[in-house]
Amino acid sequence: IFVSDGAKCDLGRLQAMFGADVNVAVQDPSYPVYVDGTVMAGAGGKEPVTENGFKDITYMPCLPENGFFPDLSVVKKDSLIYICSPNNPTGAVATKENLTELVKFAKANGCVVLFDAAYSAFIRDKNLPKSIYEIEGAKDCAIEMQSFSKPAGFTGVRLGWCVVPENLKFDDGSKIADAWARITNTAFNGASNIAQAGGFAALDD
């Protein structure tokens, strides 16, 4: 578990870690940072953006017809799959069945799920998962980001955390957690003591 300056910052650094030569799939609609971070890392393709988006990004429509959960069949093998639940901006929450399907797909196709759980504090139904790690096998294929901005109003204070399981690995067998530690130690000096003290108080609350 890596303490950070918020989920938004983690999302940008994660894309930088995976680099430009990775396939990326995003929910559509979704939080703009997923696409922006992908493009800034060079993974959006070299062609100019069109009304259909960036050529090298797979957009997964989330519509009433599919219960606002994407059709994973459009996702390429070895992709980073951005999933936000509850979703920003639709508010749709992925069910346990949805996330079970996602984990099975990711493991079968060599994908890594980047699960944005920033709005999980607003889930009141005990039957709906707040974390992807409630799903068996998720620790083999998923990274989860969390934020204090939504439940505690820390938008300007900046505090969050990122979970990178020890058994999550690159194709060469090296640990993603080790690469993430190097990225964060290089590009980030740590959340302030004031922010972390506020985080402890918010958790106690």
Predicted regions and their residues:
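Active-site phosphate-binding strand-loop segment of PLP-dependent enzymes
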Residues: 49-130
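Short glycine/serine/threonine/alanine-rich loop segments
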Residues: 43-44, 111
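A short helix->loop->beta-strand "cap" motif at the edges of active sites that frequently abuts
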Residues: 22, 108-111, 138-140
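Phosphate-binding glycine-rich loop
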Residues: 1-24, 41
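Catalytic P-loop NTPase motifs of RecA-like helicase/translocase cores
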Residues: 10, 33, 120-122
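Conserved core segment of the aminotransferase class I/II
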Residues: 48-50, 134-205
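Short hydrophobic alpha-helical segments of the AMP-binding
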Residues: 34, 38, 106
